[in-house]
Each structure stands twice: as structure tokens, then as C-alpha cells.
């Protein structure tokens, strides 16, 4: 077992930690757990690096130039560290996450201001590392893959912290990926697939619900590859886990992301039909509509199999809102390949989507392909693709006008007395003149307008709090 960091002495001054998060929802979860794991050592979270004794950059390596953005931020932190040193104050600087995993020792060589480099599977040892550095120890680089050890060592979040984070929460149930898509760094930065045991997931979910969370999003790089054992010791998949979580009293909503088409099994599809708490929304990345490009990406499915999966899902849950990821300009992509992607979008119809220009990631097979698509072609294709997706998203949102939906209010809006919540379909819903007591509640809302990126509505007369 790793050495634990020191417990804070009663009455000792609270130290402060600032974590800046880049990238995906899993990093949001990881950042929150870093704060949790430092709490027993006397650290409290602050909103600005200037106020902190420790600054952690929790990084993402998916997009191009991710590392350079981190080094740029480290340049600013170097100046802050100098300022603090001039006032007799110390500042420890750490880099965590996937850029840290990929860069390793190179990060401390290029940026000596960094005291600590730790990969995504080692942040549970943060108190130990900080204690060693505080005692004058040398800089630390730790990029091992002890995934099970990490989750077994994480404390439950304090109730007050969970309350402060709101009525929605992320819960990581799976990490890593074994698919090895040729464009993706995840298998190299997050490691092979690992699934958390059912009991630990249920314990964490109950803790969140006890603290006021009403909606939990299950996270994984390949979340529907999660597997475990049911109460009888038989193999279980995500559909079983969702049913078990839905039995937790007080948990109103469940979601999960991100999925792979290869792992959409019948039990999971049936859960969409049978479990009321599972929201009618599915993010199922396809990346391309061209079979040739899908094969080059090593996606292990073709366009037709994706269509068949969508057909089974819609048969089980006719009102489901579909979301996806698309990459344009993958090496070798022709105009015909791109048109096949547009055809798939027109045929399926998406309520929401995320789209990107292909960016070579060092160490991935696609990065060394010779037939890279010119940048101007990528940009032009992305513009066309996003225009089509935007039309579909607007049509879906506009079609919600006149409907009454249960909305979970989890944010305060920009305007006075404005609240923002989530519909079952993950749309942002804005209402004005909202009573403050509805924050964190699930309430029926009449949708009046549907815009491209949000809905606007009003409370139903005599609307009661649903949860």
C-alpha cells in the first residue's frame, strides 16, 4: 500500500489547492477526487491559482497541441511561483492526467518549475507525494497504471463538498480502452480496460445520493465495456449495473457516456426500454459514415452495423435522443468518403453531436500515414458537416416546443432569478423568475421555445417538485 500523507493537526491553518481541468468529463471527476483525497491533509479547494499552496493542471491529450497549451500555462505559473517566493510563500506545481502520462520525465526537463508529474492512475497518492515534496524531496514523476489500487484508495467525498457541487454528479465506473482506434491516444495514456466492482460503485452512488445528488452520469472511456459480477457471482454487464443503481432510493436519473457501438448489447438496449431512471439520451460515437475510413480507423464496425444498432435502440426507446462524434479529414478521406458521412447523418438524425478536424496524435498509427488531408480541406468539410448537424439539432429542439418536461435545475443563469436545468434529453432549459428553492429540484416545465443550443420554458402552473 502507498504511504499516506499526514493528517492535518486540529486547529492548524487550512492549506489551499487549485485544480484546473482540461478535457473530458472523466477529468472533471478526477479533479474533484484529487480535492477529496487532499482534504484529510488539511487542504481546501480555492477558485484561483493565486490563492493556492498547490496548483494541479489536470490535462487532456485528445486534441492537437494539447501539450503546448499546458506548457504555456506552466509559463504563467512559473511567474506566479516567483512572485510567491518573493513574498516568502511556497507554491507546489503539479501536472496530472493524460498529457502528464504521455510526457513523463520530458515534462520536468522542459518545465523545471513542475514539482510533480502524475498520470491518471496515480492521483490517489497525491498526499504522499505532496508530503515528500514539502519535506524537501526531489521532483516526482509517477506514471504507473495501478488502476485498482487507485479506486480502492479513494475516500468518499465529504457531504458538504458534494452538496456544493450540485444536484448532478459524475461517477467513473470504467477506465481505459482495448479498442486501439488508430487515431486515439487513450489506450496509451489511460491503459487497458478496467471495470470497478459493483459494490464499490453502489457505495459511491449511495454516498452521492445521500448528499443530495439526483442525477448520476456513469463515466468510462468505453463505458459500455464495463463488466462485473451480479449478486449470484454470474458475469454482468452495464445493463445489469444500471438496473441495480436504479433501485437506490432518491436517485431520479441515470446517464452513461462514452459508448462504443461494438459493446451495445441487448441487455443494455433493454435497460433503455425498462428502466425509467435511465434518461432517453445516448451518446454513441460513429466517427465516419465511410466503411473504408472506419476500417482505416480500426473501429471494428461498419456503417450498416451502426444503422442496425440504432434501429434496435429506437425500437426499444422510440423517443431516444441520439448524439455522436465525428472526425473529418482522417488520412485518406476522399470527398466520396465525406459524403458517406453526411448521408449517415441525414439517415440517422442526431439531436446533438460533437465534430472535429482530424489531428495527428504522436504515437498513434494514423499519425504516420502519408495521405494526410490538407488543412483547408478539413476546415471546409467541418463547416459543411457542422451546418448539417446544426440544422438537425435546431429541428430537434424546436420540436420540443409545447411539450411539458421534467427538468432538473442544476445551474443559476446569467439573469436575476434565472435557473438553468437539464431536460431528459440533456438539453439546457432556461426559465426566468424562478423561485430559488427550486435549485437542485426536478420540476415540470412547459417548453415555449427551442433554439439551437438550448430550450426556454416556464414553470407549469402549480408545478410540484418531482424529486
UniProtKB/Swiss-Prot annotation:
GO terms for molecular function: 4 iron, 4 sulfur cluster binding; metal ion binding; N6-isopentenyladenosine methylthiotransferase activity. [4Fe-4S] cluster 1 binds at residues 24, 60, 98. It holds the Pfam family UPF0004. Residues 398-461 form the TRAM domain. [4Fe-4S] cluster 2 binds at residues 177, 181, 184. It catalyses: N(6)-dimethylallyladenosine(37) in tRNA + (sulfur carrier)-SH + AH2 + 2 S-adenosyl-L-methionine = 2-methylsulfanyl-N(6)-dimethylallyladenosine(37) in tRNA + (sulfur carrier)-H + 5'-deoxyadenosine + L-methionine + A + S-adenosyl-L-homocysteine + 2 H(+). Its main location: cytoplasm. It is found in: Cytoplasm. Binds 2 [4Fe-4S] clusters. One cluster is coordinated with 3 cysteines and an exchangeable S-adenosyl-L-methionine. Its cofactor is [4Fe-4S] cluster. Residues 163-395 form the Radical SAM core domain. Keywords: 4Fe-4S, Cytoplasm, Iron, Iron-sulfur, Metal-binding, S-adenosyl-L-methionine, Transferase, tRNA processing. It is an enzyme of class 2 (transferase). Residues 15-135 form the MTTase N-terminal domain. GO terms for cellular component: cytosol. Its EC number is 2.8.4.3. InterPro entries: Elp3/MiaA/NifB-like_rSAM, Methylthiotransferase, Methylthiotransferase_CS, Methylthiotransferase_N, Methylthiotransferase_N_sf, MiaB_methiolase, rSAM, rSAM_horseshoe. Catalyzes the methylthiolation of N6-(dimethylallyl)adenosine (i(6)A), leading to the formation of 2-methylthio-N6-(dimethylallyl)adenosine (ms(2)i(6)A) at position 37 in tRNAs that read codons beginning with uridine. HAMAP family: tRNA_metthiotr_MiaB. Belongs to the methylthiotransferase family. MiaB subfamily. Monomer. This is tRNA-2-methylthio-N(6)-dimethylallyladenosine synthase. It comes from Parvibaculum lavamentivorans (strain DS-1 / DSM 13023 / NCIMB 13966).
